[in-house]
Amino acid sequence: MEIHYTVNKNALILISLMKQYGIKKVIASPGTVNVPFVASIQQDDYFEVYSCVDERSAAYMACGLATETGEPVVITCTGATASRNYLPAMTEAYYRKLPVIAVTGTDRIENTGHLMPQSIDRTQIQKDIAICSVFLNQIRTDEQEWRCIVDANKALINSTRRGGGPVHINLEINNGYFCKKD
């Protein structure tokens, strides 16, 4: 069986850092935009991947797993309207200081405001759903790679630091591009 991973360097950095932080549990609600991230995690034996097509249920599952294990739990879906279903559980995680890490896959931010489907403004989030929110852009330069590493670390650290809590990582994805594992 051939194994394929995303060529999105920002996603590969995030996956690598998740491993370095010992984050294993991922609840995936795959959609068009986050498929490269989800597929890469599914093909990596390190991760425990749970599938949940309903984003609201996925977020509450993450709260339950984080409560039971005391470990950070990743939830992932597309970053447009689907991610809005995370709000009730993320609010709960915020007030209970649960280490839930929402990774939302987003298409190019330039599409916002041009009547493109599933292209909504994601630059602002509600105050009480995450203690930290970062945007991991596509990487084209060494400086962007450094910024991605810093921001991803910031989010992952904050999920457990000072009592912890939910964090949001918006991952810009260039869809449809995979490469074979060597």
Which residues does each PLM region occupy?
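N-terminal alpha/beta PP-like core and its mobile active-site loop of ThDP/TPP-dependent enzymes
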Residues: 1-182
